[in-house]
């Protein structure tokens, strides 16, 4: 059992960090940050790339537009399990299930559910007195649709319902808490080029994608408290695909993504000395302010620091065996996530199994997923029914 102050729980999950230390840390934080965690092991093994990768049963989590390029009439069910902070506590985890189906050679749909359990927590007040044992959790339900605009381009959208129960409705310092609820939408575009012959009997192709995710109403955990931004995110990426021969294929991906929410200002004695207070902005205004250098204490330089870079590679042998690696880089003043990822996959008949493993890039960078093995499994429903 974990023992955790309710105050700390709320601070680390829903409140923006506004103070800065000598190194000028200014991390952009939001509510429900688990919406940004890679739910599947294939992307997790490639440095969390996904907006331009080849379509699979988890495409809607990264770019709903990729659903239009699923194989004609193919339906699949994907399951993923991610232990969270497994080196510290045994009962925090993220579970994910996704159903996808190609309606035709031009349309695709999906429905998915993500469930994040914080395990069993003994809540205490400021004096350390027990307030009871609870099981906080969050779940997100999505539906997505994609349509080909041409032979190479597609567009897709997703709608998302968000439910976050972190406090089980208990009262904190006279403030009655409640579960946070909101809704959000995704919009994405995807390009998939044809393979062209190159020297040595090999062939190459390119892919690209862009997606804005989690654009929706702010979420609040009390009737009188402030509402927090959802983790609205913009992801842009590209992929290069090399078909070495009939059996061997290599894909390389690069994604750039950033949060589309206001940057916390610099404050001294409760007064803003640099940047702006974004608490009163609407989600749409927050999107525009995220690109405004004047709204950030560090100006244009800080705006660039908020970009996160993802690099991934996937080697495929005979559509049967997959080896993957990747790297994620976040600026040291914006969270300092820097880690290498590894993984492999195996496809046999109607089943595909993927695994991912995360290694911190340096002793000074840590992750809740470090040295943790993650699992995903996909089931080809149409292939099973055809047997």
State what each model feature region is.
Residues 1-23, 258:
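Bacterial Sec-dependent N-terminal signal peptides
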């Amino acid at each position: 059992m974990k023992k955790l102050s309710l105050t700390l729980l709320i601070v680390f999950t829903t409140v923006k960090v506004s103070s800065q230390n000598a190194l000028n840390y200014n991390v952009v934080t939001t509510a429900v940050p688990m919406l940004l965690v890679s739910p599947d092991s294939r992307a997790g093994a490639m440095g969390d790339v996904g907006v331009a990768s080849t379509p699979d049963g988890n495409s809607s989590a990264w770019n709903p537009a990729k659903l239009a390029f699923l194989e004609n009439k193919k339906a699949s069910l994907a399951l993923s399990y991610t232990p969270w902070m497994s080196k510290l506590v045994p009962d925090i985890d993220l579970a994910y299930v996704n159903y996808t189906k190609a309606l035709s050679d031009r349309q695709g749909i999906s429905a998915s559910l993500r469930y994040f359990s914080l395990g069993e927590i003994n809540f205490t007040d400021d004096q350390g007195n027990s307030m009871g044992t609870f099981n906080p959790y969050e779940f997100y339900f999505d539906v997505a649709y994609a349509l080909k605009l041409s032979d190479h381009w597609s567009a897709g959208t997703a709608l998302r319902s968000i439910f976050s129960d972190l406090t089980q409705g208990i009262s904190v310092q006279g403030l009655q808490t409640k579960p946070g609820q909101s809704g959000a939408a995704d919009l994405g575009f995807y390009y998939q080029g044809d393979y062209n012959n190159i020297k040595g009997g090999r062939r190459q192709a390119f892919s690209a994608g862009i997606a804005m995710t989690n654009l929706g109403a702010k979420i609040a955990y009390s009737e009188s408290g402030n509402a927090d931004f959802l983790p609205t995110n913009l992801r842009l990426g590209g992929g290069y695909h090399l078909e070495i021969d009939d059996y061997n294929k290599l894909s390389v991906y690069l994604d750039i993504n950033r949060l589309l929410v206001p940057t916390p200002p610099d404050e001294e004695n409760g007064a803003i000395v640099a940047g702006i207070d974004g608490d009163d902005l609407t989600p749409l205004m927050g999107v525009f302010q995220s690109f405004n250098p004047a709204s950030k204490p560090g100006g244009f330089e800080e705006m660039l620091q908020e970009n996160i870079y993802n690099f991934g590679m996937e080697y495929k042998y005979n559509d049967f065996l997959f080896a993957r690696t990747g790297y994620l880089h976040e600026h040291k003043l914006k969270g300092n996530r820097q880690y290498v990822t590894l993984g492999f996959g195996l496809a046999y008949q109607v089943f595909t199994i993927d695994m991912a493993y995360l290694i911190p890039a340096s002793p000074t960078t840590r992750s809740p997923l470090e040295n943790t093995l993650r699992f995903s499994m996909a089931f080809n429903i149409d292939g099973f029914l055809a047997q």
